[in-house]
């Protein structure tokens, strides 16, 4: 994979795609699905206050629906997003 390092207080995240089915069992195409808002953190830029913002590579997060810039790396979808658009960290 090409290495992408976010600049400033930004993250590189990979959306977690969940297969969406109707109640009747029909799998919906990507164009009919809502944009995913869960992602895995792939790279972290320079965070000014790391104690306040405890996000690291591998964490799963929920982000603002229309935030960030979508990019493709090796035919995979990623988003470069500002840390302020991260709404929550998912702990499993």
UniProtKB/Swiss-Prot annotation:
Subcellular location(s) of the protein: Cytoplasm
Gene3D superfamilies: GroES chaperonin (2.30.33.40)
A single Gene Ontology CC term: cytoplasm
GO terms classed as biological process: chaperone cofactor-dependent protein refolding
Pfam families given in the database record: Cpn10 (PF00166)
Keywords annotated in UniProt: Chaperone, Cytoplasm
GO molecular function: ATP binding; metal ion binding; protein folding chaperone; protein-folding chaperone binding; unfolded protein binding
Keyword Chaperone tagged: yes
Family matches, as InterPro entries: Chaperonin_GroES, Chaperonin_GroES_sf, Chaprnonin_Cpn10_CS, GroES-like_sf
Role of this protein: Together with the chaperonin GroEL, plays an essential role in assisting protein folding. The GroEL-GroES system forms a nano-cage that allows encapsulation of the non-native substrate proteins and provides a physical environment optimized to promote and accelerate protein folding. GroES binds to the apical surface of the GroEL ring, thereby capping the opening of the GroEL channel.
Assembly information from the UniProt record: Heptamer of 7 subunits arranged in a ring. Interacts with the chaperonin GroEL.
Family assignment from sequence similarity: Belongs to the GroES chaperonin family.
UniProt name for this protein: Co-chaperonin GroES
Source organism: Thermotoga petrophila (strain ATCC BAA-488 / DSM 13995 / JCM 10881 / RKU-1)
């Amino acid at each position: 994979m090409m290495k992408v390092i976010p600049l400033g207080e930004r993250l590189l995240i990979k959306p977690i795609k969940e297969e969406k089915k109707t109640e009747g069992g029909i799998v919906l195409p990507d164009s009919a699905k809502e944009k995913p808002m869960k992602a895995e953190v792939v790279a972290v830029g320079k965070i000014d206050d790391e104690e306040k913002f405890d996000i690291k590579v591998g964490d799963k997060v929920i982000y603002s629906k229309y935030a960030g810039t979508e990019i493709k790396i090796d035919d995979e979808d990623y988003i470069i997003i500002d840390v302020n658009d991260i709404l929550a960290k998912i702990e499993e």
